[in-house]
Regions:
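Conserved, single-site charged/polar hotspot
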Residues: 1-253
Length: 253
């Protein structure tokens, strides 16, 4: 049963063109979590894209599953909780800043490239702002269609601005969105202020300043969900505000 689940998880998570040599390491790295206490799979990022055992698989996924049968990635006697993302934005984030408050020595912040240039201290707002507004060299900073077709399914390739992206809201859109997603009435949104960033520049805590209420939210996923009808690609973002000439207190967008 477990191997059957892995076959169908690997298929939606990776294209049929994915290099066979990389699939075994992908399986060992990710799909080796300890069993949930009360159920086998969850709908969170922990279990990725499990879509049922009847979901079509690929020969590559099937071969990789059987080639890695019984293999797990360990650290000091425990199975590694080795999360991953399709695009890190140029820098890895430390585990505790995105998920549970547990610091894993094998999941640390570092640069996603071969360059010897040291990763800036992206916990500092000035450095994070500069980093996010530029496009540093990184393995995931590519528009090479041949490379992308090997690692992403067709529907994932529809997103072309995954490395650096932009979202724009009017005052009304933003205030209504935050109210709907958080269940809290902030009134008009005056500002979104970074309170804490992780080692990759991702926001861990964000202060929402409204005309009726001010509140700090976090962590990373809550911030992404609050500021989008689904979720933002990342919490590694900076905010620019625009004002109308006759209104300098509250941004128009």
């Amino acid at each position: 049963v477990a191997n059957g689940k892995l076959k169908v998880i690997m298929h939606p998570d990776n294209t049929a063109n994915f290099e066979l040599s990389t699939l075994p390491s992908q399986l060992i790295k990710w799909y080796d979590h300890e069993t949930h206490k009360n159920f086998d799979v969850c709908a969170d990022d922990h279990c990725q894209r499990y879509q049922g055992i009847t979901r079509a698989s690929t020969p590559q996924a099937i071969e990789a599953v059987f080639a890695t049968r019984g293999e797990v990635l360990m650290y000091e006697g425990e199975i590694c909780d080795a999360r991953f993302s399709k695009c890190c934005g140029g820098a890895f984030e430390e585990f505790q800043n995105c998920w549970e408050n547990v610091k894993h020595p094998y999941l640390i912040g570092q640069r996603d490239s071969k360059t010897e240039t040291r990763l800036p201290d992206l916990t500092k707002e000035a450095e994070a702002d500069k980093w996010i507004r530029t496009s540093p060299t990184a393995f995931c900073n590519t528009h090479n269609k041949q490379v992308l077709s090997q690692v992403l399914n067709n529907y994932d390739q529809e997103t072309t601005d995954f490395y650096r992206w932009r979202v724009c809201y009017s005052q009304q859109e933003l205030s209504e969105l935050i109210h709907k997603r958080s269940g809290i009435e902030f009134g008009k949104i005056i500002d979104l202020i970074p309170v804490e960033r992780g080692t990759s520049g991702r926001l861990v805590r964000l202060k929402i300043v409204g005309t009726l209420r001010t509140l700090i939210i976090g962590k990373e996923l809550e911030i992404r969900r609050t500021l989008s009808s689904s979720h933002l690609y990342s919490s590694a973002f900076v905010v620019d505000k625009e004002y109308k000439e006759d209104e300098k207190e509250i941004p128009s967008r």
